[in-house]
Amino acid sequence: MLEAINLSKSYNGTAALHPLNLKIEPGEIFCLLGANGAGKTTTINLFLNFIPPSSGNARIGGLDVVDRSLESKKLLAYIPEQVMLYKNLTGLENLEYFTSLAGGEHTRTELAGFLAEAGLARADADKRVGAYSKGMRQKVGIAIAIAKKARALLLDEPTSGLDPKASNEFSAMLKKLSASGAAILMATHDLFRAKETGTRVGIMKHGHLVATYATSELGHADLERIYLEHMHD
């Protein structure tokens, strides 16, 4: 579970995130929508403990990410817009390295299986990451989450720049991870992808979470209309 309790962040007296209360249950995919500067990435960074909160708490699996940093990180996987991998290593070698940092011990056969589960072909797993497309790098990121058995997954604009086929494959993998019990928080500008992937969406504006909706209750046109209404308020 991911939980924000009166979570806020200010810089020199200017609020980047006003007090946020949000709970994302296991099996949920919550998509944060909003313009640049709305507070989406700030929210992600607070859960990652990349920046300290000005007030409140961010919790992963009930563990405060500041007070229980090492323990909470073991429950977590993170996929940014550009997955940071070592270009001179293969996809398999990258997966082996990053899972070992998290304390995982897997055979190369098991690691290849995680990559295959994430949609990366066996032949591609043995290629250097420098030759990978963005979609292939994202699959390595998903494989890391699978190998860690992550209970929470944070994503910041993960489908930006992906072609429709790769975006659909990525969404399918997120749904598979959520079905296994992971709580997922994804920041995105893509209304279509949020509707197709998320179980809930939240709209952020000027550091406030101004509205949340269940995607099952909205059509694509409904979400676009509601989003634009909030942006023009």
Question: Regions from the language model: what does each represent?
Answer:
Residues 56-67, 71-72:
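Conserved ABC transporter NBD signature motif
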Residues 96, 100-103, 108-124:
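Conserved ABC ATPase "signature" region
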Residues 153-156:
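Catalytic Walker B motif of ABC-type/P-loop ATPase nucleotide-binding domains
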Residues 164-166:
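Helix N-cap at the start of a conserved alpha-helix in ABC-type nucleotide-binding domains
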Residues 188-189:
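H-loop/switch region of ABC-family ATPase nucleotide-binding domains
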